Amino acid sequence: MQPRDKKLRPHFALVVATMVVLGLAHGWVNPWLGFDRGAIEQGQLWRLLTCHLVHLNHWHMLLNLAGLVLCGYFFTDLLDRVRFWSWLLFCGAVTGLALYFLDTGLQHYVGLSGILHGLLVYCLLQGWRGNPWLHSLVLLVIAGRIVSEQQAGYDVEYLRSWIDGRVYVNAHLYGALAGVLLFGGITGVEYGRKRRTGNTERR
């Protein structure tokens, strides 16, 4: 499986390294970078993005880093610098804004898992034509899991002994939907670019 963009590697490594540093220093950086409704209302809008890069503890960071690295490995033929940074910025912003405007009772939030769902959904949609059966199956599993997380009685505390907090399932929903929007947006832009290139070549 050939990488789509070999120059993505240092960009990917930069994000991973940033998460490791922030994860190791979570006790110091979380008060400044985590989702904090009161602080956001006072103008600290960067928290809508940076909240996805910080974590509750080292285990929380490692779990999400493992997911990110696996996505980077399995979808190396689909990701390039534009798509990667579009995911981080677009899904980060959309998920952060959704948490702020839709979950008005939410006061604090940290973690990559929400937008990690967005990356996974985006890559599965982007690569669907190459392996439709497998990608459809995984998308159905993700959709089923998200639906189950939204059901009353779902145990949001199942990872508390590891991550020192509950799983905030709405972030998974918002992140996955952001991934769908990202796929639509990038597909539209790339299709438009190809059409313009084709029209130019025919002239």
What are these regions (language model features)?
Residues 140-187:
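Terminal transmembrane helical module of multi-pass membrane proteins
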Residues 105-138:
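A contiguous pocket-lining binding segment that forms or flanks enzyme active sites
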Residues 49, 93, 118-123, 140-148:
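Small-residue-rich segments of transmembrane alpha-helices in multi-pass membrane proteins
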Residues 64-69, 116-122, 172-186:
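Hydrophobic cores of alpha-helical transmembrane segments in multi-pass inner/ER membrane proteins
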Residues 14-86, 90-96, 101-109, 161-171:
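N-terminal TM1-TM2 helical hairpin plus the immediately adjacent luminal interfacial "cap"
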Residues 23-27, 75, 100-103, 147-153, ...:
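Transmembrane helix-loop junctions and nearby membrane-interface residues
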Residues 96-101, 123, 143, 180-184:
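Alpha-helical transmembrane segments of multipass membrane proteins
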